[in-house]
Amino acid sequence: MTWTQVIDPCHNRLASLGVALVPVLAIFWALIIRKMKGYQASLLATALALLVAIGIYRMPVTLALLSTFNGAIYGLFPICWIILPAVFLFNITVRSGQFTIIRHFMASITSDRRIQALLIAFSFGSFLEGTAGFGAPVAITAAMLTGLGFNPLYAAGICLIANTAPVAFGSIGIPITVASQVTGLPELAISQMVGRTLPLLSALLPFYLVILMAGFRRAKEVAPAALVSGLSFALIQALSSNFLGPALPDVLAGIGSIVSLLVLLRWWRPKTIWRFPDESPSADSAPAATPVLVPSPADPAAPPAPRTHLLWALSPFIALTVIIIIWGLQSVKDWLNATGTLTFQVPGLHNAILDVNGHPIPHLYKLNYLSAAGTAIMLAALMSLALSGLRPREGLKVFTSTLHQLRYPILTIAAVLAFAYIVNDSGITLTIAGALAASGVLFPFFAPLLGWLGVFITGSDTSANALFGKLQASTATSIGVDPVVTVAANVSGGVVGKMISPQSIAVAAAAGGLVGRESELFRFTVRHSFILLAIICCLVLAQAYVFKWLIPVYHLHSLH
């Protein structure tokens, strides 16, 4: 049995667009207005998408159900396989007492929550995005900030927004590599174009984060830190993406930003230490709503731990960093893929759906159990368990409690990926994309919105580029705009959709202890997603028609 996708099931583009938007808007309605829990909103959206796919798009029931099930399985592996070991590793550090030492160490650097957020959420998170990606950075940094005493909502929300800067070059540049593969455009040209758009956002983001946390007046107190953090990151991101390609910008910019900020803190400190409400001057406990300010001539902190204790406490994150770097090496990745990958054709679904041009769509399930980022994190967690001093029985207890802690996030993520797969396979996303592509000369303005939508639905900039990259290139060519502008816009627009993707929300909520409060987290980030998206849309429109000198010179391959 085969079935061909349709873009205009109602034989009226406006009516088809309205129907296609129903399951997408349902997520916004459920989380913002009804304030549903994440798994409830995701299951509702998936059910609506199934009804639209079967009832309006005439997708066979069997194919629709298989597509939904395939998405849910993908949600379990590799996505949940990242979150489970990441939270397990963090819980080991808490149970062993290692995180208490880390908390005191962070306080010895600075107990100011604003600067802690810059170091961990922005800089360290960017480094992790460059090496691991796919949810791991948000899971790890949100857990760390919550453990340091951040308000859980702010910890998760700040990490989601901070993750905007590095997503385009995440996982050793895989989003741009995929964009190049599906469009035929040179990888370096796309990297250069993205590297001439995102650094402006990256430079402003640290200050934006601090304003979000503490307000404009208190943000001015740490303006030197925000400027050093943002400008060092943006400069390295721009240079590396333009001269080295997409593989290293996040890693180099993350390290450069951390080093620059630590150098600044050697001779500069904020005049006041800013903390969340209900924190005493020396507290590291969870905060509330009004900040506490205390004089900070010397930034008092807990007595520093002996170096050997500190090294032991940091060993889980050192192991994590080293293993993730090793896992990211191309030669290692190739060997792991060759040794430990099982690929299955999805029964009843593989090549059963034809795209609008009549080409069969392959549905393969890839179980790369060795090269998966989650495997690297689990290896680091097991090494950390061995070094933690916990007995195996205690480690097992930590693992089972982690599973219990993540039971609803796992359900949420499975439902979100089920939703993503059914709206893609049924053609619902193509209907929405086609409407945006019909905007003519204004298409460059809407091009980032397409990437934003793709990441909102799939939770992945890589998937959004695979989904819409070719459409972006062909539409740009048809209106006389350089296709590298709109393909790069798809990448750049996608990064600001990540913070509101239900998949990302579920990951951050699980790591930050906000299970059941996903709607609060969604409302926390959604406004900022739209603000940053509007900035990128205006930038891309200007690049397409006004600042054409920003477009890199490259040899145009034929689109395929």
Enumerate the predicted regions with their spans.
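Membrane-embedded alpha-helical segments and adjacent helix-loop junctions characteristic
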Residues: 65-151, 157, 389-475
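Interfacial loop-to-helix junctions that mark the boundaries of transmembrane helices
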Residues: 6-16, 35-41, 65-77, 188-196, ...
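Structural signature of hydrophobic alpha-helical transmembrane segments
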Residues: 8-22, 75-79, 131-137, 188-203, ...
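Juxtamembrane and boundary regions of transmembrane helices in multi-pass small-molecule transporters
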Residues: 168-281, 492-560
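Alpha-helical transmembrane segments of multi-pass membrane proteins
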Residues: 114-126, 152-165, 186-203, 414-415, ...
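Juxtamembrane helix-boundary/capping and inter-helix hinge elements in multi-pass membrane proteins
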Residues: 35-36, 94-99, 111-112, 145-154, ...
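Transmembrane helical segments that form the transport core of multi-pass membrane transport proteins
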Residues: 292-295, 301-450
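Hydrophobic mid-bilayer segments of alpha-helices in multi-pass membrane transport proteins
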Residues: 19-28, 36-58, 80-87, 226, ...
